Amino acid sequence: MGAPLSTARRGMGQNLSVPNPLGFFPDHQLDPLFRANSSSPDWDFNTNKDNWPMANKVGVGGFGPGFTPPHGGLLGWSPQAQGILTTSPPDPPPASTNRRSGRKPTPVSPPLRDTHPQAMQWNSTQFHQALLDPRVRGLYLPAGGSSSETQNPVPTIASLTSSIFSKTGDPAMNMENITSGLLGPLLVLQAVCFLLTKILTIPQSLDSWWTSLNFLGVPPGCPGQNSQSPISNHLPTSCPPTCPGYRWMCLRRFIIFLFILLLCLIFLLVLLDYQGMLPVCPLLPGSTTTSTGPCKTCTTLAQGTSMFPSCCCTKPSDGNCTCIPIPSSWAFGKYLWEWASARFSWLSLLVQFVQWCVGLSPTVWLLVIWMIWYWGPNLCSILSPFIPLLPIFCYLWASI
């Protein structure tokens, strides 16, 4: 009995008329014929099992002559289970022999006259003729660009330009340029307002410090409030126009503004001197007169050409000149230092001290500034008896 059973099952892989209607032994996972035993229970990885590749495709008459299972039945809702004969598509060839597999080539694009007929209304000659107009040229070419073909002037350029603008419309405005053009003045206005508020607070702070010098140890108060005019108590820095101290407050503010203006001018002068825009002739050794301009014979020639005088010359009686080039930077500062050193000889003793201070690192300077700011008021009261000894110490240190 085992032989016919095994023979029938061995042929079920190719015989479409012998299906597995009851669903027993699906894919022969538990069939003892395919060595199902306790030593190899995992049939998912069994190499001897039969996957029945053709058993699921049930042909006509699989359930006997004239028998068609109703609405699906045991084999599901496939057309074969309903008894309908369908033609299965042929299996594709393997990938190694399939020369048509993979991405198909991109089809050829249709011609431009079919996809964009509006672009074919002008030929190349008319297009280059229309580019002669700077307004049209800006639409198609960047700044400084030019067309590769020769552009011939055409008398009907106005009509061509009008036709182009009637078809394409006016060019769109560049919003980036508009934004940058508006952002610049707004930033300048904001900076001016900020500086104006700070500048107005600086005189008030200096005025408060100035008036506090007259009220050491007592709260400041305006002396004009005790006059014949009844005025409420107020500070000397906020006198009303009816107060007698108002004119003194205005005078203090005016002096403070002049002081701030002087500081700004000094800063501008230092900046111009650093950039070499103040061509001041240095003092020549052994001479008190200098002159600028061409010389007959210069012992020292100035290098390069500039819009400023390049050398300073002394003109002796023999006609020859002694020339010294003007420094390219700090010319005015060097002139002031030479002038002061010639009249005050003790300033030369400060050169070594200045060179030593310049050699210090910025960290040391920041530390010194912080110490003076934090301990300065207390140190002044402690070191006040020793202040007369400071010039003596500086003189001894410079003479060593």
UniProtKB/Swiss-Prot annotation:
Indicate yes or no for the key word Lipoprotein: yes
Q: Which residue ranges does the record annotate as region Pre-S2?
A: 120-174
Q: Which residues lie on this side of the membrane: Intravirion?
A: 2-253, 203-253, 370-375
Q: Where is the composition biased (Polar residues)?
A: 79-88
Entry-linked InterPro entries: HBV_HBSAG
List the ranges whose topology is Virion surface. Answer: 2-181, 275-348, 399-400
Highest taxon, organism lineage: Viruses
What Pfam families is this protein classified in? vMSA
What is known about its processing and modification? Answer: Isoform M is N-terminally acetylated by host at a ratio of 90%, and N-glycosylated by host at the pre-S2 region.
- Predominant subcellular localization, coarse grouping: virion
Got a GO cellular component term for this one?
A: virion membrane
Is Transmembrane one of the keywords UniProt gives this record? Answer: yes
Q: How is it used?
A: Systematic vaccination of individuals at risk of exposure to the virus has been the main method of controlling the morbidity and mortality associated with hepatitis B. The first hepatitis B vaccine was manufactured by the purification and inactivation of HBsAg obtained from the plasma of chronic hepatitis B virus carriers. The vaccine is now produced by recombinant DNA techniques and expression of the S isoform in yeast cells. The pre-S region do not seem to induce strong enough antigenic response.
Q: Where in the cell is it found?
A: Virion membrane
**Listed transmembrane segments:** 182-202, 254-274, 349-369, 376-398
The segments labelled Pre-S in the record are 2-174
Q: Where is this region: Disordered?
A: 70-115
Lipid-acceptor residues (N-myristoyl glycine):
G2
The alphabetized UniProt keywords are: Acetylation, Caveolin-mediated endocytosis of virus by host, Fusion of virus membrane with host endosomal membrane, Fusion of virus membrane with host membrane, Glycoprotein, Host-virus interaction, Lipoprotein, Membrane, Myristate, Transmembrane, Transmembrane helix, Viral attachment to host cell, Viral envelope protein, Viral penetration into host cytoplasm, Virion, Virus endocytosis by host, Virus entry into host cell
Q: Which residues are glycosylated according to the annotation?
A: N320
Domain comment? The large envelope protein is synthesized with the pre-S region at the cytosolic side of the endoplasmic reticulum and, hence will be within the virion after budding. Therefore the pre-S region is not N-glycosylated. Later a post-translational translocation of N-terminal pre-S and TM1 domains occur in about 50% of proteins at the virion surface. These molecules change their topology by an unknown mechanism, resulting in exposure of pre-S region at virion surface.
Function of the molecule: The large envelope protein exists in two topological conformations, one which is termed 'external' or Le-HBsAg and the other 'internal' or Li-HBsAg. In its external conformation the protein attaches the virus to cell receptors and thereby initiating infection. This interaction determines the species specificity and liver tropism. This attachment induces virion internalization predominantly through caveolin-mediated endocytosis. The large envelope protein also assures fusion between virion membrane and endosomal membrane. The middle envelope protein plays an important role in the budding of the virion. It is involved in the induction of budding in a nucleocapsid independent way. In this process the majority of envelope proteins bud to form subviral lipoprotein particles of 22 nm of diameter that do not contain a nucleocapsid.
State the name under which the record lists this protein: Large envelope protein
What is the organism field in this record?
A: Hepatitis B virus genotype H subtype adw4 (isolate Nicaragua/2928Nic/1997) (HBV-H)
By which gene is this protein encoded?
A: S
